[in-house]
């Protein structure tokens, strides 16, 4: 698991706790935000395990019912397929839950908290410029109309590109990973498109700034 990927998720969860137009957080407030984000991940792990347990019990009950009560072969097959799908969902949830403790453990590493805090501060300190830049590359839309978590995913990626020197493709890929966890398919495509237009705009600006030969 990449420490910086975890740091980005902590930063996203931390930003979601800040008011829309908050002042940059103090060191103490930043530590509290990161701690709250860590607790959110731990709670998510517990929720995944509880949901997986419930789905396994439900699939077990359905399997027992199919064994005892099916009147014909077709009904048995349909019920068995339903049981298989329930079991697969439970397995997937369990896999996600087993990944999360590693994330929670890594959040205690200094490099993770340091980079996560740095991301939060860059977004907070440069909010106006970041929002203005993102609005410039949106087509017939404005950032304030986008769901809050999607806004913050875009801001984090823009902050990395504009202020931290993260390669544009890396920042875009990491933003899409966050969108896979915290947005829907439409949001993921939107985030990817906005950031690619940002990359194109920055590339054109860089080429225009080069001295002519």
UniProtKB/Swiss-Prot annotation:
Keywords: RNA-binding, Transcription, Transcription antitermination, Transcription regulation. It comes from Synechococcus elongatus (strain ATCC 33912 / PCC 7942 / FACHB-805). One of its GO terms (cellular component) is cytosol. The keyword RNA-binding applies. HAMAP family: NusB. One of its GO terms (biological process) is transcription antitermination. Pfam families: NusB. This is Transcription antitermination protein NusB. Belongs to the NusB family. The gene is nusB. InterPro entries: NusB-like_sf, NusB_fam, NusB_RsmB_TIM44. Involved in transcription antitermination. Required for transcription of ribosomal RNA (rRNA) genes. Binds specifically to the boxA antiterminator sequence of the ribosomal RNA (rrn) operons. The keyword RNA-binding applies. One of its GO terms (molecular function) is RNA binding.
């Amino acid at each position: 698991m990449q420490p910086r990927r975890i740091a980005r998720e902590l930063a996203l969860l931390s930003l979601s706790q800040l008011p829309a137009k908050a002042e940059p957080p103090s060191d103490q407030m930043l530590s509290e935000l990161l701690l709250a984000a860590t607790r959110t991940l731990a709670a998510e792990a517990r929720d995944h395990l509880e949901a997986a347990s419930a789905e396994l019990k439900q699939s077990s009950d359905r399997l027992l019912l199919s064994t005892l009560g099916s009147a014909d072969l077709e009904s048995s097959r349909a019920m068995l397929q339903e049981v298989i799908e329930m079991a697969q969902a439970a397995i997937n949830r369990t896999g996600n839950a087993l990944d999360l403790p590693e994330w929670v453990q890594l959040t205690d590493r200094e490099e993770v908290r340091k980079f996560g805090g740095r991301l939060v501060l860059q977004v907070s300190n440069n909010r106006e410029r970041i929002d203005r830049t993102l609005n410039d590359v949106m087509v017939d839309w404005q950032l304030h109309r986008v769901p809050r978590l999607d806004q913050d995913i875009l801001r984090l990626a823009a902050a990395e590109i504009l202020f931290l020197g993260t390669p544009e493709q890396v920042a875009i890929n990491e933003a899409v990973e966050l969108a896979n966890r915290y947005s829907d398919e439409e949001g993921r495509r939107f985030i990817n498109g906005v950031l690619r237009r940002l990359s194109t705009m920055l590339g054109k600006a860089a080429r225009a700034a080069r001295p002519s030969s």
